[in-house]
């Protein structure tokens, strides 16, 4: 066995921890990368500019989730072929994925740029920040192919058991983004446009470096392969499409939720946007653990080591409990200070109240998110996508129904009050599907 195969040889808790930790750190730096715009714009331009950037978040998340969902399909197949040592098929999937998704990202970029104003208007973006939001969004869409390709390549790195290179690239691009943000926003006075341009440049550099490093990484696996294969594309889409639908539909749902928040005014939106950034920091810890479980499961499925899949799932749940307690303690102790990091002196009492109330409520229930993400990660790794999709749609339906029906009548707090209930019901559905899969182990081996 080579050192690349530790996910199918080392003790599951050890292997998953070693594999997941760089991904968790990477998620942290990903959010530093994302939050740099918000913090720097909020402090050096003002809360209205922060609200303008925050107003774009729900929409940009839709497009990011398309990239993440596409990466899931490629990642599951790459992991499985890597685990079974079918390196030719693995490289064919890599090449087919990159070519197909490059075309898709270019089409989405053109669409997003062309309809930025229409989409922001449809979200009921406050009129005083509409033009600034559209400007930020259009610059974002120019760089979208870079972001798309980086996310695909990052998933492929983790699929072959390599989580340290994506971490290194994220640290580099985060530092570059912060430096460019400060220079363009504070020194050059370019405001929101400067923040968007800084992100575009950092994403471009990161995507190019990722491509070069990944191509070098897979050179060691000598085997013939096809640059494009329709059969592999079909297998890829069978896994990717449900994941794209799940992730993008959830993000569309978040856009609808934001359209409920927007009428409460710019300051309420600023407070909501600040806590959304904080939620993303902590939630991506659990997302990272779930994402680490998927290639662990896929590689062991390819190697026909079903018992290790169960052990890996239990290890993931243990990690989730540890980080849920950590998240609760941080938020309960420092929620006011965290809010001030984004809102600064320009934030009103309303902005601080919205941010603090939302943040503390989430802190009590992050464990629900953790167990949901771990269970979803195992389902993805096994290629069991239908119940995965159904569970996440039910989660979204609970969140939307409460926000749309109760928040306009009883206050903004109902936007986030149903979030934990959605997470918990999602977990129950996913766990039921997973338990059925484990009971039919012979079916797993045949996948």
Model regions and ranges:
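Interfacial/gating helices of multi-pass transporter permease domains
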Residues: 18, 41-61, 127-132, 192-193, ...
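Short alpha-helical transmembrane segments in multi-pass integral membrane proteins
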Residues: 1-20, 78-143, 189-241, 297-364, ...
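Short runs within selected transmembrane alpha-helices of multi-pass transporters and secretion channels
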Residues: 71, 140-158, 166-174, 195-208, ...
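Residue-level signal for short hydrophobic patches within transmembrane helices
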Residues: 9, 13-32, 36, 59-66, ...
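Small-residue-rich hydrophobic transmembrane alpha-helices
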Residues: 50-110, 147-166, 271-335, 369-383, ...
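Transmembrane helical elements of multi-pass membrane transporters/channels
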Residues: 18-37, 139, 150, 173, ...
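Helix-terminus/linker motif at the lipid-water interface of multi-pass membrane proteins
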Residues: 28, 32-51, 120-127, 183-190, ...
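Hydrophobic transmembrane alpha-helices of multi-pass small-molecule transporters
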Residues: 62-65, 177-181, 206-211, 281-284, ...
């Amino acid at each position: 066995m080579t050192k690349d195969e530790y996910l199918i040889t080392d003790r599951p808790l050890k292997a998953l921890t070693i594999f997941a930790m760089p991904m968790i750190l990477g998620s942290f730096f990903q959010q530093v990368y994302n939050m740099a715009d918000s913090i720097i714009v909020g402090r050096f331009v003002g809360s209205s500019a922060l609200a303008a950037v925050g107003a774009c978040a729900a929409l940009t998340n839709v497009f990011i989730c398309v990239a993440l969902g596409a990466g899931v399909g490629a990642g599951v197949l790459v992991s499985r072929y890597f685990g079974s040592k079918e390196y030719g098929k693995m490289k064919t999937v890599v090449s087919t994925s990159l070519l197909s998704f490059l075309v898709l990202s270019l089409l989405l970029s053109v669409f997003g740029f062309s309809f930025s104003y229409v989409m922001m208007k449809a979200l009921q973006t406050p009129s005083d920040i509409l033009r600034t939001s559209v400007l930020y969004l259009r610059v974002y869409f120019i760089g979208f192919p870079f972001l798309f390709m980086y996310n695909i390549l990052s998933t492929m790195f983790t699929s072959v058991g390599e989580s340290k290179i994506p971490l290194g690239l994220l640290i580099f691009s985060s530092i570059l983004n912060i430096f460019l943000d400060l220079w363009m926003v504070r020194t050059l006075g370019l405001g929101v446009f400067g923040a968007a341009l800084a992100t575009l440049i950092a994403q471009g550099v990161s995507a190019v470096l990722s491509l070069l490093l990944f191509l070098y990484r897979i050179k060691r696996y000598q085997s013939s392969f096809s640059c494009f294969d329709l059969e592999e594309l079909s297998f890829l889409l069978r896994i990717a499409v449900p994941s794209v639908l799940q992730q993008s539909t959830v993000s569309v749902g978040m856009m609808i939720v934001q359209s409920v928040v927007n009428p409460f005014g710019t300051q309420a939106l600023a407070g909501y946007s600040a806590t959304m950034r904080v939620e993303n920091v902590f939630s991506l810890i659990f997302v990272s653990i779930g994402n680490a479980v998927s290639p662990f499961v896929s590689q062991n499925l390819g190697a026909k080591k079903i018992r290790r899949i169960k052990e890996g799932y239990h290890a993931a749940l243990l990690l989730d409990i540890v980080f849920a307690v950590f998240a609760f303690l941080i938020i309960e102790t420092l929620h006011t200070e965290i809010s001030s990091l984004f809102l600064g002196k320009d934030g009103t009492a309303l902005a601080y109240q919205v941010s603090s109330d939302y943040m503390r409520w989430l802190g009590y229930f992050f464990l629900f998110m953790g167990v949901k993400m771990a269970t979803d990660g195992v389902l993805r790794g096994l290629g069991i996508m239908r119940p995965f999709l159904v569970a996440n749609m039910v989660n979204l339906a609970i969140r939307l129904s409460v926000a749309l029906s109760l928040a306009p009548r009883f206050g903004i707090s109902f936007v986030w009050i149903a979030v934990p209930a959605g997470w918990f019901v999602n977990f129950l559905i996913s766990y039921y599907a997973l338990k059925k899969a484990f009971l039919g182990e012979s079916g797993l081996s045949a996948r």
